Regions:
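Conserved PLP cofactor-binding pocket of PLP-dependent enzymes
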Residues: 194-198
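Beta/alpha (TIM)-barrel catalytic core signal, keyed to glycine-rich beta->alpha loops juxtaposed to Asp/Glu
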Residues: 1, 5-184, 189, 199-206
Length: 206
């Protein structure tokens, strides 16, 4: 798999590199935040999947046209950081000390102040998790899986027990009532802090 995490250029010609080589079975994906670019790219060469950040605390794809484009064009969507870079697991709070070299140290959402204010979102996940006999991480992933059948989150981990926990999310059933409750409660929570510092955010197309 060849994948570019950076924003792609705005011309259809620049999208000709977004190709599938069936003979070599090499898949090329790209990520973007632009509905019109997705449609134009798809017209030049059918797009297989888009990857973008999406989770309960990063919901841009719902409003920037990306999910609409995927549904209209039959494109798969692969959310990265579906657990909010670890925050939505419930394992962090304002007292959490990130180690040297931890990329999250430069992220506005991981300041102690932001972690404290965003705790309301984790509390919501913990409450639903208690009702479902699951973990906050499993609820966060189950919520994503329940959005659309063509959404496939990719939580990263280096620990076997976390992998098993993540896989368990597929067994969590969220009813329409559960999803409506999560939506209502999450809508009342204002997420504190941008995803990235300004200089990095500018490269994502938001």
């Amino acid at each position: 798999m060849v994948y570019s995490a950076r924003r792609v250029g705005h011309s259809p010609e620049s999208c000709r590199n977004v190709q599938i080589s069936r003979k070599s079975e090499a898949w090329t994906h790209f990520s973007t935040n632009h509905f019109d670019l997705v449609c134009r790219a798809h017209a030049v060469q059918p797009v297989t999947a888009l990857q973008n950040e999406y989770s309960l605390w990063t919901r841009g794809p719902e409003t920037n046209g990306i999910l609409d484009a995927c549904e209209e064009l039959g494109i798969g969507f692969v959310p990265y950081s579906p657990l909010g870079k670890g925050f939505l697991t419930g394992a962090m709070n304002k007292e959490t000390k990130l180690g040297e070299g931890d990329f999250r140290k430069i992220l506005p959402r991981f300041t102690p102040e932001a972690l404290e204010k965003n705790q309301a979102l984790v509390d919501l996940l913990k409450r639903i998790a208690g009702e479902k006999k699951a973990t906050p991480a499993q609820i966060a992933l189950a919520w994503l899986l329940a959005q659309k059948p063509w959404i496939v989150p990719i939580p990263g981990t280096t620990k076997l027990h976390r992998l098993e926990e993540n896989l368990g999310a597929a067994e969590v059933e969220l009813t329409a009532h559960d999803l409506a409750e999560i939506q209502r409660a999450a809508a009342a929570i204002t997420v504190e802090g941008e995803r990235y510092p300004a200089h990095l955010l500018a490269t994502t197309g938001r």
